[in-house]
Amino acid sequence: MGRRKIEIKAIKDDRNRSVTFLKRKGGLFKKAHELAVLCSVDVAVIIFGHNKKLYEFSSCDMRETLGRYQYYGPPHEHKGPEDFNGKRDDDDDEDETTPAPEEMQPTTQNPPAVVPAHIPSHPGFQHVNHAPSASPPISNGIPFDPRHGTPQPQGASRPSSRNHLRRVSSNLGPQQHHGTPPPPPQNGFAYIPNPSMYHPNANPNIAQQPRPPQFAHYGPQQPLPPHAIPPHPMPQPVPPHHQAPQHLPQHPHPLAQQTPAMGLSQPPHASIPQVAQPFLPEQGRNSMPPAFPTEQSQPPRPVSLPDVSSADQMVGPLKVETSPSPPHQRSLSSKSRSIFTPIDDRGSVLARHFGLGPPTCESPRTESADVKAEAKQNDSKEIKPPAQPVAPPPPPRTTADAARSQSAPDIKPPPRTNSGQLPSKRPQLKVQIPSENSDRGSATADSSSSTGNQTVTPAKANPDTNHSGVVLPPPSPSAGAILSAGATGPPNPFARPPPPGTASQNSNAYNSNNNIETPISALPSRFVSDALLPSPSSFFPEWGFGRSGPDTNMLPSPLTFPTPAVQTGPGFAREDEQEKKRKSPDSGPSIEGTAKKSKT
């Protein structure tokens, strides 16, 4: 009697609307609770407010309720705004406590009527699961048509919720509902969103870029469901393959469902990304198929297992490629090994001394061969045959004649195994330089007597090794290091044969200095003058320590741009002069340079 009727339409005034919302929301929750208790039913009410806040009431766990809704068939009764527009006059008694139609729909049978439209922004349970799925556009766009059991007005808003909720329940929904109810709605559209979850495994490359990282989550996740929640993985992959033909025309992003075919064809093409990914698909798919057999496993298996096999095949070729790669290097470097053939084939000094002291000739090289064998095993752990050929290499390296005396087929493997390590061999030339005296003392019986007093840098010795290889003259003063440097390495490209007199003088000078028998410097011979080096300033003339050109009296300026003629700042000129004074000991004319600079 005292209650006035209000027209059910949107309230424009913000204050009145907020008051009405709070009042009717409380009444709706109260009614929902009473209904749940009185009738022993599960009620879920979800309200998205204007202030972007979420209000929900649930007589039991909200996620469980939504998951159950996802797997139920078409609702037995569905109410929409049009159902209440004309009946409002008859229901005046309940008007005070019942909310507006938008708020009333979330009750028991149709909570998603409101949920769907807004669910992407749902901050609570939905948002967490919605992020991994990585396909909001797919879910929102897909399933308007496939929704068969409900009136069309709700079709627009409901499918989006259906998709998102399905993702939630696929991980969180109760297990007992998986078996029986799903089939009718599944063929409608129940699992459309799931291709986006499942096929990032099959086709992470074709899909959008954000998917592979999310697939990294699916790899760990899906091994778990087969053990913890067996039913979930089964329905997920199976329906997408059955339903893919139905929904491809309607699908805004057909990539997710075309992936079964593309996933098979892709691994051969995209070999580089597959290197990292074959393992992830194997995790996902090897864990998935065990769950499939309980339901229809035929469609997903062809898709999953071929990918796994193709992934294995991809891994296989990669392993094969990694193993052949050392042979390629060997073949390339075996060509470069031709540097050694002139020395070996002449058989010059080595052939003569090989019979005298073969152990000493081979001892340093067998060590180097062992080092190379270790390096080789590190390079290709899968190739173990080279370990056997490593034993023959020392003879072929020392002399080709000795190698030929063994057996012709043995020569072919060793160059491959050894020459693969040429890059590591060249440093060993310099490592073996200190041991040249021991080699010389034992192996070179002829030249040791004359060269015991005269040792020259191996840089200058190498050219003579070539000459001695041709004619074998009487041992020259520079033939000392022939075994260590000349036989094992290529001739020094920097070497310049010294004049005999200066060579002997230099060697005598070296020996007079504390009996230094090793080279006095490791620099190439082009930097070494005929006498002992006067000062380090002549090593690298381009460094500008001492100049021997037209600009001898000018030190190089530390500044590349012209310096100002007038002293603009006190500190600038002082620093400049200090630098020149500091350099004056190395080059005599620097004082003149400073004087000239200061005059200008």
Curated annotation (Swiss-Prot):
Induction text: Expression is inceased two fold when the MAPK mpkB is deleted.
Source domain of life: Eukaryota
UniProt main location, coarse: nucleus
Polar residues composition-biased segments: 151-160, 328-339, 453-468
InterPro entries assigned to the protein according to its UniProt record, in alphabetical order: MADS-box/MEF2_TF, MEF2-like_N, TF_MADSbox, TF_MADSbox_sf
PROSITE patterns documented for this protein: MADS_BOX_1, MADS_BOX_2
A Pfam family of this chain: SRF-TF
GO biological process, one term: positive regulation of transcription by RNA polymerase II
CDD domains: MADS_MEF2_like (cd00265)
Bias (Basic and acidic residues): 75-89, 364-384
UniProt keywords, alphabetically: DNA-binding, Nucleus, Transcription, Transcription regulation
Entry's Gene Ontology cellular component terms: nucleus
Single Gene Ontology MF annotation: protein dimerization activity
Subcellular location: Nucleus
Phenotype of null mutants: Affects sporulation and reduces the expression of the DHN-melanin gene cluster. Also strongly decreases the production of fumiquinazoline C.
Annotated region (Disordered), positions in chain: 71-518, 542-600
All copies of domain MADS-box, residue ranges: 1-61
Pro residues biased stretches: 222-242, 386-397, 490-501
Segments of skewed composition (Low complexity): 243-260, 440-452, 503-515
Main function: MADS-box transcription factor involved in the activation of the dihydroxynaphthalene (DHN)-melanin pathway and the fumiquinazoline C cluster during conidiogenesis. Specifically recognizes a DNA binding site (poly A/T stretch) identified in the promoter sequence of the gene coding for the polyketide synthase pksP and of the fumiquinazoline C cluster (fmq) promoters.
Family listed: Belongs to the MEF2 family.
Protein name: MADS-box transcription factor rlmA
Organism: Aspergillus fumigatus (strain CBS 144.89 / FGSC A1163 / CEA10)
